[in-house]
């Protein structure tokens, strides 16, 4: 009888143990890697979004020749001819590459998981949307009509992957919506001008709006007769920058040369944002 009681006690303890295991907190069982970044364990805070957007700074570089600036409209003849000959592929295509835009969309699709100060979170969402606007307008300058994607596509999204190009008007309106969000939600300048803040986003908005306005004014074949609204956006953005009182034209002898031939631009009040080159940190042109 005593043996049977002991067996029953052991069985009861085992049953309670099983119940305890089945009642464990799900988060205890679902542990994510603590030594590598995973999608499930990331995008939880504004700090995560900041880390992710740091990688996007390379999407806007200092243009060291006119073909890479908005002073010259670059025609993608080489890429077009390569495509006609069947030679174009993801490894040799340049402007037609979509990896950077997908990286931005990847973050934007998951940014709603972030918790904390919404002003901080929206700053980095606005920053990402500004980068997407710049990346997309580069494609518009080269091809005019391009497919617009607002989310990161998967290999199973065959319909969207093979969809035709969207009209320039739709793409540019989407670009301007990204820039509107950026200038509304990004924080005002704070600290070094080597980081993107609202004034930098306003400058990007002005630059893209002015370029698009000029295209629509002088290219009637587009059938887009609303250049003036883009000129107004550009003018309003420039006025907003001036109204901050943080910037002023560089004047005096050698002022123009100082803009392009100085080792340190941190004290130049004409700089809205600049890249600080440093041999020590390995940041070079």
Residue ranges and their predicted role:
Residues 2-11:
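Bacterial N-terminal signal peptides that target proteins for export
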Residues 10-18:
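Sec-dependent N-terminal signal peptides
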Residues 21-23:
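C-terminal motif of bacterial Sec signal peptides marking the signal peptidase cleavage site
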Residues 25-78, 180-181, 195-285:
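An aromatic- and glycine-enriched ligand-binding surface/loop that stacks and positions planar moieties
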Residues 38, 47-50, 60-62, 77-143, ...:
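Conserved, well-structured interaction surfaces
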Residues 71-73, 145-149:
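Outer-membrane beta-barrel and related beta-rich outer-membrane complex signature
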Residues 140-141, 147, 190, 211-220:
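Short coil/turn linking the two alpha-helices of tandem helical-hairpin repeats
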Residues 146, 154-156, 278-280:
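Solvent-exposed loop/turn segments at secondary-structure junctions
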């Amino acid at each position: 009888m005593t043996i049977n009681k002991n067996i029953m006690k052991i069985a009861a303890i085992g049953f309670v143990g099983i119940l305890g295991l089945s009642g464990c907190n799900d988060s205890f069982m679902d542990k994510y890697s603590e030594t590598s970044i995973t999608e499930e364990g990331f995008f939880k805070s504004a700090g995560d979004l900041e880390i992710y957007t740091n990688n996007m700074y390379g999407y806007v570089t200092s243009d060291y020749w006119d073909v890479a600036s908005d002073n010259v409209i670059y025609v993608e003849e080489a890429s077009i001819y390569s495509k006609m000959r069947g030679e174009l592929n993801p490894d040799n295509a340049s402007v037609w590459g979509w990896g950077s835009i997908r990286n931005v969309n990847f973050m934007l699709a998951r940014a709603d998981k972030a918790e904390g100060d919404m002003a901080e979170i929206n700053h980095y969402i606005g920053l990402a949307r500004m980068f997407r606007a710049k990346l997309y307008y580069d494609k518009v300058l080269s091809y005019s009509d391009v497919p617009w994607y607002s989310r990161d596509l998967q290999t199973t999204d065959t319909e969207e992957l093979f969809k035709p190009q969207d009209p320039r008007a739709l793409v540019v309106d989407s670009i301007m919506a990204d820039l509107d969000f950026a200038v509304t939600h990004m924080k005002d300048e704070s600290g070094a001008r080597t980081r993107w803040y609202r004034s930098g986003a306003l400058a990007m908005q002005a630059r893209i709006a002015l370029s698009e306005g000029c295209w629509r004014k002088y290219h009637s074949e587009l059938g887009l007769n609303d250049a003036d609204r883009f000129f107004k956006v550009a003018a309003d953005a420039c006025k907003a920058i001036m109204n901050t009182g943080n910037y002023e034209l560089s004047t005096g002898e050698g002022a123009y040369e100082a803009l392009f031939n100085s080792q340190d631009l941190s004290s130049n009040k004409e700089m809205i944002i600049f890249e600080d080159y440093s041999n020590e940190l390995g940041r070079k042109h």
